[in-house]
């Protein structure tokens, strides 16, 4: 039994048309799904490549003196533009972990958000469009756009509190561990006070 279980856990999840058809019917805008060993072109990007893109865009922001596309939070408080420019990744950090170690030594709770990761390298754009094209065949096109963002930090809670995203979200861990606390949609509807709160101790048992 143990051997069979181990074999099952190591099996890869292929995001083919059969998968997307089932996903659209059973999960899309209905409930969350956690997958292991996913086979996707998006995962071709290594953490070192992502770091290089991050530094490239950070250099662009410093040159333009405009951190648009980046957001930085400490203890849940959003930093102003001047502060953001001071804490962006640098080539001397050498890696995502190197940047994290530098920020971790300065801030007990921080979160860096970058929503423009692919804007500086069009050669990687196809990785996102290949992924979304397969999805759109089964759920239709969005009325706005798709983007690839990066969240990096040591934050214990999302900087803007408990929330419902106004779009579909796919999360791929790049380095380290990412945890989510989720509530059933029906529970959230019955408890609107959950929205944007940081104090949800009494609701934890229902998550």
Regions found by a protein language model. Give the residues of each.
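Active-site region of the double-stranded beta-helix
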Residues: 2-26, 40-47, 51-207
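Anionic coordination/interaction segments
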Residues: 28-30
């Amino acid at each position: 039994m143990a051997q069979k279980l181990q074999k099952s856990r190591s099996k890869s999840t292929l995001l083919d048309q059969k998968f997307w058809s089932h996903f659209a019917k059973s999960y899309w805008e209905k409930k969350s799904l956690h997958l292991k060993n996913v086979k996707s072109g998006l995962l071709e990007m290594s953490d070192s490549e992502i770091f290089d893109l991050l530094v490239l865009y950070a250099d662009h922001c410093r040159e333009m003196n405009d951190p648009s596309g980046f957001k930085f939070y400490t203890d849940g408080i959003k930093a102003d533009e001047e502060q953001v420019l001071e804490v962006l990744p640098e080539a001397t950090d050498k890696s995502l972990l190197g940047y994290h170690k530098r920020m971790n030594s300065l801030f007990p709770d921080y979160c860096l958000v970058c929503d423009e990761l692919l804007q500086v390298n069009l050669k990687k754009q196809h990785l996102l469009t290949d992924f979304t094209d397969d999805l759109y065949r089964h759920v239709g096109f969005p009325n706005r756009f798709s983007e690839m963002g990066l969240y990096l930090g040591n934050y214990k809670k999302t900087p803007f509190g408990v929330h419902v995203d106004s779009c579909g979200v796919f999360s791929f861990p790049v380095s380290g561990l990412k945890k989510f606390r989720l509530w059933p949609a029906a529970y959230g509807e019955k408890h609107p006070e959950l929205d944007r709160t940081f104090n949800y101790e009494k609701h934890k048992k229902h998550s």
